[in-house]
């Protein structure tokens, strides 16, 4: 008998300021749509939760319709619904979770609440091969900076090797960009302004890289302060602004890549995955590639369009869970703004264990 295809999984992402919807089946992206409220937040220099939530309410149904249209499907073709249940902005998450439950109930299909960061880990699945098992993952975004040991993403616990003690890398980019007079969002602005400038012009500190420091723990608050103090102390400096920006960026990516490479070596794991919004940074991608090649490691980074928040990564993770035989999430699952990353799925009815 012919093998029956897996169901079409609709993924919904509303954790911050992007409204993303995508449709995936058997690891293949069928269609997607994305809407952002970034421009509405720019005047405030950061994301305003109430504005983000209202934008999700306005954009979600049109995104569902657009994703279905791009796939040539109808709502009746959807066989499961996956949604980011956390972490993120509470009101923004609530919009997505409520909509996902409504679609799942109306269509009488399974509902899967998933962890936003696990979605980032799955972002490349529709464009590449299955993820190696095990691997070391570096998640770098506006709200999170973590080094993880990842096995089977659908079944195994996710092990934290180290996290940031204060600011996340993306948060540091945004705050320093503001100090340097760059527009919001700061990460892409820093990346653009650093191109062609001297990353060795200024020796900004590399936090927690000393012999006695925790090898996998991050801290970027001190670096942020060091840049701000340098700018304040040198109002008439002859150092070009582009060199200041490039030197700051180099300090961040130097720390990120050095700690990630060390984690791979210490745990004797030959694969490194870098994901999250900061993974779109051109210097991080280049330095990671250079250092992985020198260390004999295999590097995997999603395409830039998959690094920032999107519905594709949530649909891809939902599809992986469905194909792995994971039980649906509890129907009473609520948004979990502070969800800790130790499993890909949230609100599991019966946790799926790896076969012995």
Swiss-Prot record:
It is found in: Cytoplasm. It is an enzyme of class 2 (transferase). Required for the formation of a threonylcarbamoyl group on adenosine at position 37 (t(6)A37) in tRNAs that read codons beginning with adenine. Is involved in the transfer of the threonylcarbamoyl moiety of threonylcarbamoyl-AMP (TC-AMP) to the N6 group of A37, together with TsaE and TsaB. TsaD likely plays a direct catalytic role in this reaction. The keyword Membrane does not apply. Binds 1 Fe(2+) ion per subunit. Keywords: Acyltransferase, Cytoplasm, Iron, Metal-binding, Transferase, tRNA processing. Fe cation binds at residues 116, 120, 309. It comes from Frankia alni (strain DSM 45986 / CECT 9034 / ACN14a). This is tRNA N6-adenosine threonylcarbamoyltransferase. It catalyses: L-threonylcarbamoyladenylate + adenosine(37) in tRNA = N(6)-L-threonylcarbamoyladenosine(37) in tRNA + AMP + H(+). Pfam families: TsaD. GO terms for cellular component: cytoplasm. Substrate binds at residues 139-143, 174, 187, 191, 281.
